[in-house]
């Protein structure tokens, strides 16, 4: 049994090619597994990327497929929207090695605010055509056929000649954005995105507009002002209005009980009669004084009400019943005649507070 086992082992070894040994076959098959083939271009992958479904393709092949259907070419699973911006590279070191290049020169195509380096396969095709003196050559990029015009140094799609992009042959060490649409550094990615947006003027304009709006909002608001410790509305009156208001307050303070009573009536308050009164008002004199001073006193009362309306309403529906209640109060007094009555007068001070005075 042991000899049979050895014979089988020897037979399996003899099945290998004569120019290779078992150790050599194992060492040679390992690297071949690290270079997958692309099911789209049917060639070895250039900058292979892995989709969420674990299928591997060339980055440019996935880019072309996403333009057409945004689905995997094998299982039809959807490709994420941000996959082209953040692809899953199988060998990031290969990308950096490709940016350094193998020779002295490399081929580039024009991008926004910079140049992109062609992938290794396309660069070899361009260099071969250039060295042979060809005027143009065709390239398969992202599933589309492009024509490289080596005389005018432009490239365009074979079925769309209107859109042209500059190309050039330059040294390998020039500043570049990346290789075949893949950026070399994440930090550079952020900087370049900001510069591209600012070059268009969209982000810069929106940023300036946002700043102007933020600056305009606080300038339109004013702090609350105070009159004798009481807050008033944010709208500040003119200097003339402030002077007239102060004069009216001083006039109200110097006036007697008759002025306070008339201001009380002007606000729509009703008189409260009491049998224990000690004064008989002279209605004829009061009516004459009220008629003479109504024009001078009603104005400051209205101004004071307007300045304190937003903070504290004094008496509701006062302006609607001024004339009616004034006439009614005069009638009640004339009917009372020489009788005795007591009036509780509530006058308003300049600071907005009310006091009750017995007469």
Curated annotation (Swiss-Prot):
CDD domains linked: RING-HC_RNF146
Bias (Acidic residues) ranges: 284-298
| Linked residues for Glycyl lysine isopeptide (Lys-Gly) (interchain with G-Cter in ubiquitin) | 86, 96, 132, 177
WWE domain sequence ranges: 93-169
Q: In which tissues is it expressed?
A: Expressed at relatively high levels in the brain. Also present in spleen, heart, kidney, testis and liver. In the brain, expressed in the cerebellum, hippocampus, striatum, cortex, frontal cortex and, at lowest levels, in olfactory bulb (at protein level). Predominantly expressed in neurons.
Outline the segment boundaries, as ranges, of region: Disordered: 197-243, 261-359
Post-translational modification summary for this protein: Ubiquitinated; autoubiquitinated. Autoubiquitination is enhanced upon PAR-binding.
Pfam families cross-referenced by the UniProt entry? WWE, zf-C3HC4_3
Instruction: Name the residue ranges with Low complexity bias.
Output: 199-212
> Which segments of the protein form a coiled coil according to its record?
none
Q: Which terms under GO biological process does the entry name?
A: positive regulation of canonical Wnt signaling pathway; protein autoubiquitination; protein K48-linked ubiquitination; ubiquitin-dependent protein catabolic process; Wnt signaling pathway
Q: What mutagenesis or variant effect is reported for residue 55 to A?
A: Loss of ubiquitination activity
| Pathway in which the depicted protein is active | Protein modification; protein ubiquitination
GO CC annotation terms, alphabetical:
cytosol; nucleoplasm; plasma membrane
Q: Which residues carry this modification: Phosphoserine?
A: 290, 294
Q: Is NADP among the key words of this record?
A: no
Subcellular localization is given as: Cytoplasm, Cytosol; Nucleus
> Polar residues bias: where?
217-235, 306-324
Concerning what turns on (or off) its expression, the entry says: Up-regulated in cortical neurons by treatment with N-methyl-D-aspartate (NMDA). Toxic doses of NMDA fail to induce Iduna expression. Sublethal exposure to oxygen-glucose deprivation also induces Iduna protein expression. Also induced by treatments that result in resistance to subsequent ischemic injury, such as 5 minute bilateral common carotid artery occlusion (at protein level).
Q: Which reaction does it catalyse?
A: S-ubiquitinyl-[E2 ubiquitin-conjugating enzyme]-L-cysteine + [acceptor protein]-L-lysine = [E2 ubiquitin-conjugating enzyme]-L-cysteine + N(6)-ubiquitinyl-[acceptor protein]-L-lysine
Q: Where, in this chain's numbering, is a glycoprotein bound?
A: 109, 112, 116, 146, 155, 165, 177
**How is the subunit organization of this protein annotated in UniProt?**
Can form homooligomers. Interacts with PARsylated AXIN1, AXIN2, BLZF1, CASC3, H1-2, IPO7, LIG3, NCL, PARP1, XRCC1, XRCC5 and XRCC6. Interacts with DDB1, DHX15, IQGAP1, LRPPRC, PARP2, PRKDC, RUVBL2, TNKS1 and TNKS2. Binding often leads to interactor ubiquitination, in the presence of the appropriate E1 and E2 enzymes, and proteasomal degradation.
**What does this chain do?**
E3 ubiquitin-protein ligase that specifically binds poly-ADP-ribosylated (PARsylated) proteins and mediates their ubiquitination and subsequent degradation. May regulate many important biological processes, such as cell survival and DNA damage response. Acts as an activator of the Wnt signaling pathway by mediating the ubiquitination of PARsylated AXIN1 and AXIN2, 2 key components of the beta-catenin destruction complex. Acts in cooperation with tankyrase proteins (TNKS and TNKS2), which mediate PARsylation of target proteins AXIN1, AXIN2, BLZF1, CASC3, TNKS and TNKS2.
User: What is the official name of this protein in its record?
Assistant: E3 ubiquitin-protein ligase RNF146
The organism of origin for this protein: Mus musculus
Which lineage?
Eukaryota, Metazoa, Chordata, Craniata, Vertebrata
Q: Identify the coding gene.
A: Rnf146
